[in-house]
Amino acid sequence: MRNDVHMGHKARKRFGQNFLNDPYIIDGIVSAINPRPGQNLVEIGPGLGAITEPVGREVDKFTVIELDRDLAERLRTHPELADKLTIHEGDAMRFDFTQLVKPNNKLRIFGNLPYNISTPLMFHLFEFHKDIQDMHFMLQKEVVNRLAAGPGSKAYGRLTVMAQYYCKVVPVLEVPPTAFVPPPKVDSAVVRLVPYETLPHPANNLQWLERVCREGFNQRRKTVRNCYKSLMSEQVLEELGVNPGMRPENLTLQQFVAMANWLDANHK
């Protein structure tokens, strides 16, 4: 039997499809999500319904976003799910999630994300952080490590800083390749992202925050002094509580934001 066919559907490489089929892992993910009736639940990329079906047993209504028209059609005719689902057929990367927001009922988003788009999709979702209660995603384990990393670690980078700017990051469980059909070439993991009600270190201009992150992490081996010499003096760095002799990978989120806010105030 071909290892890229599951439940009669051939996995499509261009959509980055790997179908989850391990009952133990599925139970662990659904327990982590803890779906309840009345919640504003949204699944990105339901695929063949491995998580969709058990979530559907817990709630009356929820929303799914599916790019693959064949899989969307399967869900429309699914004997258990058809009446419970609102199906949006399209690309989550271009989706306006504000259209799903209900009064006093923030979005709870979950999904087994295609690994080839997981990082840009998370950046897209961060734009809606005020409307999201939490997110649970299956991702490449390496990406989860980056999301949860601390300053000074090899995994610490731009994704870390931007994710932790918006969200509390909690790794939930690790998932081996054997849990999927076809098995991916990498280990996977589930992560919980909980957007802050109030940002702990708000930036006055996100473009400056993204720039100081980009310039710092693109030159990881340079000192802070050399990375940012065209933007701010050594004296300014010291006034901001930043050691000019350290490397950017050792800067905290708070320090990146302090630098971004100084640049916003002084580079008009």
Curated annotation (Swiss-Prot):
Which annotated residues bind S-adenosyl-L-methionine? N18, L20, G45, E66, D91, N112
- What is the name of this protein? Ribosomal RNA small subunit methyltransferase A
- InterPro entries (UniProt xref): KsgA/Erm, rRNA_Ade_diMease-like_C, rRNA_Ade_Mease_Trfase_CS, rRNA_Ade_methylase_Trfase_N, rRNA_adenine_dimethylase, SAM-dependent_MTases_sf
Q: Where is the signal peptide?
A: none
HAMAP family from the xrefs? 16SrRNA_methyltr_A
Q: Which gene encodes it?
A: rsmA
Entry function? Specifically dimethylates two adjacent adenosines (A1518 and A1519) in the loop of a conserved hairpin near the 3'-end of 16S rRNA in the 30S particle. May play a critical role in biogenesis of 30S subunits.
Q: Which organism is it from?
A: Vibrio vulnificus (strain YJ016)
GO CC, alphabetical = cytosol
Catalytic activity reported: adenosine(1518)/adenosine(1519) in 16S rRNA + 4 S-adenosyl-L-methionine = N(6)-dimethyladenosine(1518)/N(6)-dimethyladenosine(1519) in 16S rRNA + 4 S-adenosyl-L-homocysteine + 4 H(+)
- Domain of life from the UniProt record: Bacteria
What terms describe the molecular function in GO for this protein? 16S rRNA (adenine(1518)-N(6)/adenine(1519)-N(6))-dimethyltransferase activity; RNA binding
Q: Which UniProt keywords apply?
A: Cytoplasm, Methyltransferase, RNA-binding, rRNA processing, S-adenosyl-L-methionine, Transferase
Q: Name one Pfam family in it.
A: RrnaAD
Q: Where in the cell is it found?
A: Cytoplasm
Q: Does the keyword Cytoplasm apply?
A: yes
Q: What does the similarity note say?
A: Belongs to the class I-like SAM-binding methyltransferase superfamily. rRNA adenine N(6)-methyltransferase family. RsmA subfamily.
Q: Report the EC number(s), separated by commas if there are several.
A: 2.1.1.182
